[in-house]
Amino acid sequence: MEKFTIYTGTTVPLMNDNIDTDQILPKQFLKLIDKKGFGKYLMYAWRYLDNQYTEDPDFVFNRPEYRKATILITGDNFGAGSSREHAAWALADYGFKVVIAGSFGDIHYNNELNNGMLPIVQPLEVRQALANLKPTDQVTVDLEQQKIFSPVGEFSFDIDGEWKHKLLNGLDDIGITLQYEDLITEYEKNRPSYWQ
């Protein structure tokens, strides 16, 4: 996993509440098994007018000024619903590095973290201020300081210490285990012969 320390990007507002994982990535696209390629299907029912991928010009992701945004500002209960990790894959493949919401579905929150994204919980007034930024305004997220720096202010956020450590060091679960490789090897050497 890529390290996440300080990230600067532009925002796109999608202030709907209760965006569930089926809206993020509909079930018909769950057959793909590689993490790459899901970005095309992100918010499929909202982004496209038909199954020929004719873009809906009124949907915010399709507006030229927001196409390169990498920080999503959204409503409460983002990622509710099923546990499909594919929804996080779609967000990451589309290019999102940070999602700022009022709250997250528990499993989806962890799926975003496991895929190197930073989900941040902020109150409505902060999200509204960020949602009203100009499309060219830069926002910086500093994980070490746990702060968001923007033209409309500086905001603190919370994150579990273990997740913070994993993101700052680019460690997934396997990477964490490999930190203890010497101890594991030593333990295996000292096991009774019938276990080896």
From Swiss-Prot:
Entry superkingdom: Bacteria
Family in the record: Belongs to the LeuD family. LeuD type 1 subfamily.
The encoding gene: leuD
GO biological process, one term: L-leucine biosynthetic process
GO molecular function terms noted in the UniProt entry: 3-isopropylmalate dehydratase activity
Signal peptide range in chain numbering: none
GO cellular component, one term: 3-isopropylmalate dehydratase complex
Keyword Amino-acid biosynthesis tagged: yes
Pfam families attached to this UniProt entry: Aconitase_C (PF00694)
Subunit structure: Heterodimer of LeuC and LeuD.
Job description of the protein: Catalyzes the isomerization between 2-isopropylmalate and 3-isopropylmalate, via the formation of 2-isopropylmaleate.
Catalysis: reaction(s): (2R,3S)-3-isopropylmalate = (2S)-2-isopropylmalate
Top EC class for this record: lyase
Name used for this protein in its record: 3-isopropylmalate dehydratase small subunit
Pathway named in the protein's UniProt entry: Amino-acid biosynthesis; L-leucine biosynthesis; L-leucine from 3-methyl-2-oxobutanoate: step 2/4
Alphabetized InterPro entries for the sequence: 3-IsopropMal_deHydase_ssu (IPR004431), Aconitase/3IPM_dehydase_swvl (IPR015928), AconitaseA/IPMdHydase_ssu_swvl (IPR000573), IPMI_Swivel (IPR033940), LeuD (IPR050075)
Entry's EC annotation: 4.2.1.33
Keywords: Amino-acid biosynthesis, Branched-chain amino acid biosynthesis, Leucine biosynthesis, Lyase
UniProt keyword Amino-acid biosynthesis, yes or no: yes
Gene3D superfamilies (UniProt xref): Aconitase, domain 4 (3.20.19.10)
